[in-house]
Amino acid sequence: MNTHNARDSDDESPLESEEHLKRFFAGRNLYSQTKIDDARKKSHDAKYAKEVEWDAKDTAKGKPVFKKYRQEIADKTSRCDAQFINNLHTYYGNGSELRELPETHYAVDFMGTTIATTEMTAELKKLKVLKKKTATSQFVREHRQLGFIPTPSRRSLSCTGRFMNFETKCDERPDRTNPEFSVGNNNFLSATISNLDEDFKTPSNCEHVASIVPKEISNALTALIPHVNVFDYEKGEMEIGKVLCSNKNLHAYVIPKQHDQEQMLKDFSARFLAWYNKLSHLQRDTFGTDKDPKRSGKQEDGKPMKPYFWRVNVILCLQEFQEEGTMFRRARHVCGIRPHKSQPGLDLYIEIDTGSMRALKTNYLTVRKLPQEFANVPTPILEVRFEGAKTEEDVARRIAHIRKTGRAYIKSFDTGKRKIYQNSFFNGQPKDWSNIETAVLLPPKESSMSKLFCEDRDCMGLCCTDQWLENAESSPGISTIPASWIADKNKKPFVDRSPQKFKFPASGSYMKPAN
């Protein structure tokens, strides 16, 4: 290898290195080993589903069934995309036929095939391999109560003497104990937005006030999260459809790809229209306005009341979307704007279900305050923060990677008290709320050809390189069927050699435990 060239390649930017990898893989006869493993898992899942169906039928007839199948539980927080999971201690069958229950494994069973019986092996045989990870959790729980472990620790830490004095540093989380953000908060007032999506733009009729709008948009998004319900998400990989923007607090606002925004708009509009039709004529004219009886006569510290729509969640009535069935839309008031001195003032809103910006003239026919009954409808907008990102440049690089790959890895969630706060508005039956406020995203896994395995214990090798095989992949060992066999197939008697469906034996011997 030319060391001079190798040294030059180290100085290449990530984009230049990516182009080098594309040129390296182009035209080569390669295939992905992870796809073989995925096919095996799909085959197993299909067999497992059939057996579960048969088990349900047999159990319904009063026949007890003692079977447990292979359970593959991958680490969803790992950035390795080539994990091979083989949980030996929960593998009681292959999903297509019964297996006798294996004997309990001991630690000594994995040391060798032939081991002399010694005092050490006798002690090892007393240590059973646990099927559930209860011993470690019990150890951590007991020592946490004794004060040896001040904060929750990772399960993978070894239980040594040094572990007793180990102290972990929790990730800093934003203080969300009070859902109402204080106006005197300097960070709140000085916030601005960056890394805007192409579709997330200020409307054309208020471009000249761009110096004011970014700060107000950031404030509106930050205040929106505690006041609107969100979907429940799982840890692990998530497909991101759009990154709206980021702010100076190093948070970003994304819309996962799993949500159909058009369908959400139609569902909400139909739901709101059904609710609206049940109101009386007086309630239809006054709800969510200054004329609402629930609002009249109220003042704040002797000061004039702010408009009913001011920096709260509202309902927009957009006649231009009536034919599409999405006329009624949820939104958050951002700020008031005046395009020109000679023109009347407008108000800027951000839609809760799409993240789109709308500037329109506010009146009783176009804007109403959002009834509390609809606050628990989840929004697809998810607030995220990036683990390890310390500057806005770090956030910009992470957002650029998400927009390029369309994927992100959720490590954990920052939770608040949305459920307690929102249910305080209801005197009757409390509604379902999610306390998820911010998703913590792991740094992206960089593709590397310098090492075969990553740090994940279940890595099969060459992880995170499948993206380079998309255009160069070819299946190994492709075979063709001779034309002569096809011609003679109808002449020869055809014998179905496919395996028959497994049938339970008549006796109950299969339920006896293994010897």
UniProtKB/Swiss-Prot annotation:
Predominant subcellular localization, coarse grouping: cytoplasm
Phylogenetic lineage: Eukaryota, Metazoa, Ecdysozoa, Nematoda, Chromadorea
GO biological process, one term: regulatory ncRNA-mediated gene silencing
The organism of origin for this protein: Caenorhabditis elegans
Keyword Cytoplasm among record annotations: yes
Recorded GO CC terms: P-body; perinuclear region of cytoplasm
Localization per record: Cytoplasm, Perinuclear region; Cytoplasm, P-body
Protein's UniProt name: Protein pid-4
Positions of region (Disordered): 496-515
Function: Together with pid-5, it is involved in gene silencing mediated by a class of 21 nucleotide PIWI-interacting RNAs (piRNAs) that possess a uracil residue at the 5'-end (also called 21U-RNAs) and guide the Piwi protein prg-1 to its DNA targets for silencing. Together with pid-5, it is required for the biogenesis of secondary and tertiary 22G-siRNAs. Specifically, promotes the production of 22G-siRNAs from the 5' end of target mRNAs.
Cytoplasm among keywords: yes
UniProt KW keywords: Cytoplasm, RNA-mediated gene silencing
Quaternary structure and partners: May interact with pid-2, app-1 and prmt-5.
